[in-house]
């Protein structure tokens, strides 16, 4: 059974927030024990990237997180594909940001367009750099990657990854959009090999139509939370002990506290 103290719930930076720091400050003020930094600057200049946060600000983030027992993670920009050499310089910036802020995990998307074996080879330098600083690497499912991709990914990683340095970030909203499990993210989980280590969770909802990132309990689970209960039960069976990140900045922001309260009640 999950020990509540081992499961942390937090929020994430957001393009729609008033400032880069606003969601983090909200997490601190409201007692969240996890937080994720997601550099999301787009072509129009909206959002933020690693260059926008100074060395001094990074140290303040690290010290604040330590003082408030907040576990930090960093979500690499979605377009950073380890298979593409032109993205490696930016990926290094993301790693430095994680190191400077004391983050315990870096999250990247799984890109399977050149095959799973090619992706495994591509992340070798990344996982070695992170392991040097005790930082875990989480590989996230996208709407285009399914359970079988992750079963193959971790069967290959088990051949070279001992002790394990890499785990899965289970994105519930993306699992709900996966072609093989559309509108049935529990089926996605059930199709995962029991040996796939889920170490991080991204939590948001949709109706199977697009990646709308609805706050938890405002989409299908608002009418029937059975799916969320099933998710938590499955994570208990897997001895999940990582962070659950609420991937939205809702209005009002107090929805985040309400979501956390309901989740903790379900976790028990």
Region spans (language model):
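Catalytic-core regions built around general acid/base machinery
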Residues: 52-69, 122-129, 156, 188-191, ...
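N-terminal pre-domain/capping segments
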Residues: 1-92, 99, 167, 268
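Active-site beta-loop-alpha junctions enriched in small/polar residues
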Residues: 12-16, 38-42, 77-79, 111-113, ...
């Amino acid at each position: 059974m999950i020990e509540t103290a081992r499961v942390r719930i937090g929020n994430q930076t957001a393009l729609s927030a008033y400032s880069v720091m606003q969601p983090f400050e909200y997490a601190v003020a409201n007692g969240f024990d996890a937080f994720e930094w997601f550099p999301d600057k787009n072509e129009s200049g909206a959002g933020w990237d690693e260059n926008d946060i100074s060395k001094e600000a990074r140290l303040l983030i690290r010290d604040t997180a330590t003082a408030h027992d907040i576990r930090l993670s960093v979500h690499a920009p979605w377009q950073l594909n380890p298979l593409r050499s032109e993205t490696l310089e930016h990926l290094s910036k993301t790693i430095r940001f994680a190191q400077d802020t004391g983050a315990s995990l870096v999250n990247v998307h799984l890109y399977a367009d050149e095959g799973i074996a090619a992706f495994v080879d591509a992340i070798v330098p990344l996982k070695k750099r992170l392991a040097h600083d005790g930082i875990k690497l989480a590989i996230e499912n996208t709407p285009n990657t399914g359970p079988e991709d992750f079963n193959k990914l971790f069967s290959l990683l088990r051949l070279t990854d001992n002790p394990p340095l890499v785990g899965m970030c289970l994105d519930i909203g993306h699992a709900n959009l996966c072609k093989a499990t559309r509108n049935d993210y529990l089926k996605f989980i059930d199709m995962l090999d029991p040996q796939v280590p889920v170490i991080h969770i991204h939590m948001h909802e949709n109706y199977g139509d697009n990646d709308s990132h609805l706050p938890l309990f405002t989409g299908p689970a608002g009418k029937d939370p059975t799916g969320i209960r099933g998710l938590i039960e499955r994570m208990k069976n897997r001895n999940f002990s990582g962070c659950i990140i609420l991937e939205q900045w809702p209005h009002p922001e107090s929805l985040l506290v309400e979501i956390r309260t309901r989740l903790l009640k379900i976790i028990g």
